[in-house]
Amino acid sequence: MNPVRKTFQYGNSTVTLETGRIARQATGAVLVTMDDTVVLVTAVAEKEAVPGRDFFPLSVHYQEKTYAAGRIPGGYFKREGRPSEKETLTSRLIDRPIRPLFPDGFMNEVQIICTVMSANKDVDPDIASIIGAAAALEISGVPFQGPLAAARVGYTDEDGYLLNPGFKAIENSKLDMVVAGTEDAVLMVESEAKELTEDQMLGAVLFAHQEMQVAVQAIKEFAQEAGKPKWDWQAPEVNAELLEALKAKFAGSIGEAYGIRVKADRYAKLGELRQQAEEELAGEEEGKFEAELVKKYFSKLEKACVRQNIIKGEPRIDGRDTKTVRDLKIEVGVLPNTHGSALFTRGETQALVTATLGTMRDVLMVDALEGEKKDSFMFHYNFPPYSVGEASRVGGVGRREIGHGRLARRGVQALMPNLEEFPYAVRCVSEITESNGSSSMASVCGSSLALMDAGIPVKAPVAGIAMGLVKEGDSFAVLTDILGDEDHLGDMDFKVAGTEKGVTALQMDIKINGITDEIMEIALEQALHARLHILGEMNKVISEPRDSVADNAPKMETIKIDPDKIRDVIGKGGATIRSICEDTGASIDIDDNGTVRIYAESKLAADEAIYRITEITAEAEVGKLYRGKVERIVEFGAFVNILPGKDGLVHISQIAQERVENVTDYLKEGQEVVVKVLDIDARGRIKLSMKEVTEDEKASMAG
């Protein structure tokens, strides 16, 4: 073994890349260490592509092992199960900047596995994983146009931009952004922010790109020392004869088809033309071409036609110019029994979004490497096949749905009230009922509307918009509110969510090199105008949260009790609190600091539960009257229960005005009496009196 190591300083972190010691049979393997977080990243690539394959089979698997944090997994089998949401999102985060750096026509299967083997609880392993994946590919010899690196950026008013902040620093930051890029260009941005300006967001991207050059250079030097010989791979030759034949016969017809505004009709016409091209140009005789090749080149021609029209300044596929948002239709309160609902339609993209309130028992428990966390805000995104007019498998949640749900959640997260202001668990669900471009941003708009419809005190309305780019040479066009086809045929997917004040989420994926600062600035500016337009239309329907939550939402009351009394409220084995919940129908949550939250279907039920709790936790007060029950009679008096678990002594001399010879002549066990507290001694013993209670006081207690 001849291990090769490269160590470099990356902000406040020390990063070490190592290869040649572990996983030596992989095409490329790098062990990345970043402040005691250790990630093993392997890249394995097929030497030959499967004949006839027409897609690039890249798969990225990020996995966290519980032993990395010194823990044994839960569950019956005590081993890691299916990928968590964090693992799925990080897999996508690694995939997105890597995918565009493989050359066109490379169809060999590539699999990247990132395994977190040691975890520093303040360091997110995602940056180390992206750096490791880039380094593993760079030394593997696989055709790859790297190296690339990644950086996390935070922002505070006091310190400005922060490079690779840890979890603790992010808690106090107004920004959590991950940027990946090469020496020359930014390829991917993923972020959430607390209403930062467009200039601040762009500044963060440029700051990250500048700072990551240290890592890019380190990977380059590492590959020079440890890299394998580059593969002798040649891109497939362009079949100029087929391309010219397709242009001559179908370019005009394709252009006309893309003038059809309705997506289904447009797809039907393009399908007819594709079929016609196969019939005319595919076959085994001389001068004909393979059917799959005809389909492939027909798609290339489609892309070229649409892109040229946009660059020339001609109307887009649906007739809009580059800055116009599609027609909007906005409704709230569309579902009668949900706590909040909205139907947001933008052109042929539609999201039906609901907001549901729950108790603190409904919060999501997240078992992460850095420790267990409670998540009181959940956002789930569903993309059924009917939304694009298809009939296909309906099954579990896919990576795409998890990713889109997290992006939409980021858009509204910063505007959600904290638990002190609004102690409810909240779940938003976005059902995509139609899709033709940027359903995730429709989900942001719909969720903002649904949350306000539910009476949840969000700080401001939020809207989202997707931008696109077509770039040919030095000419480019930035597109507002892209269609699905424009996303597929374009060079950039740029999604921005925010309020009137600033940006709350920014996601960017770039498929080409050469995206300039100017292009990003124009995209952010156009997105701002589009966002303000959408917010204006949303505000016409609902501009602030409703005054109260829905009638069928849980009613919540909060009281404080002495923390020492918590055990009394819970009771032996939970018997007392269970009895209160069963009798009143309420749900009760108690924090360690004595905060008690009561959730009930009606205020009457909540008040009854509060009364029961205050009875249990109440302390006797000197001079106060109580209605009590005689529990036990002794020679010198009687013990009377005045509060749950609280008995006091009525001395024989305090039973009546006259002299009492026998207590049993005046009192019986189980008898209800009105008493006054005379004194409470240092040991908590309560002295009671019956004779000090006046007739008027007795009457008031009876009423």
From Swiss-Prot:
InterPro entries, alphabetized: ExoRNase_PH_dom1, ExoRNase_PH_dom2, ExoRNase_PH_dom2_sf, KH_dom, KH_dom_type_1, KH_dom_type_1_sf, NA-bd_OB-fold, PNPase
Gene Ontology BP, a term: mRNA catabolic process
Annotated residues for binding of Mg(2+): D487, D493
RNA-binding recorded as keyword: yes
Occurrences of domain S1 motif (ranges): 623-691
Subcellular location field: Cytoplasm
Catalytic activity field: RNA(n+1) + phosphate = RNA(n) + a ribonucleoside 5'-diphosphate
Main subcellular location: cytoplasm
Cross-referenced Gene3D superfamilies: GHMP Kinase, N-terminal domain, K Homology domain, type 1, Nucleic acid-binding proteins
One GO CC term on file: cytosol
Superkingdom, taxonomy of origin: Bacteria
UniProt enzyme class: transferase
Requisite cofactors: Mg(2+)
UniProtKB keywords: Cytoplasm, Magnesium, Metal-binding, Nucleotidyltransferase, RNA-binding, Transferase
CDD domains on file: KH-I_PNPase, RNase_PH_PNPase_1, RNase_PH_PNPase_2, S1_PNPase
Domain KH: 554-613
EC number: 2.7.7.8
SMART domains recorded: KH, S1
UniProt GO molecular function: 3'-5'-RNA exonuclease activity; magnesium ion binding; polyribonucleotide nucleotidyltransferase activity; RNA binding
PANTHER family per record: POLYRIBONUCLEOTIDE NUCLEOTIDYLTRANSFERASE, POLYRIBONUCLEOTIDE NUCLEOTIDYLTRANSFERASE 1, MITOCHONDRIAL
HAMAP family named in the record: PNPase (MF_01595)
Oligomeric and partner information: Component of the RNA degradosome, which is a multiprotein complex involved in RNA processing and mRNA degradation.
Function: Involved in mRNA degradation. Catalyzes the phosphorolysis of single-stranded polyribonucleotides processively in the 3'- to 5'-direction.
Family: Belongs to the polyribonucleotide nucleotidyltransferase family.
Identification of the protein by name: Polyribonucleotide nucleotidyltransferase
Higher taxonomy: Bacteria, Pseudomonadati, Pseudomonadota, Gammaproteobacteria, Oceanospirillales
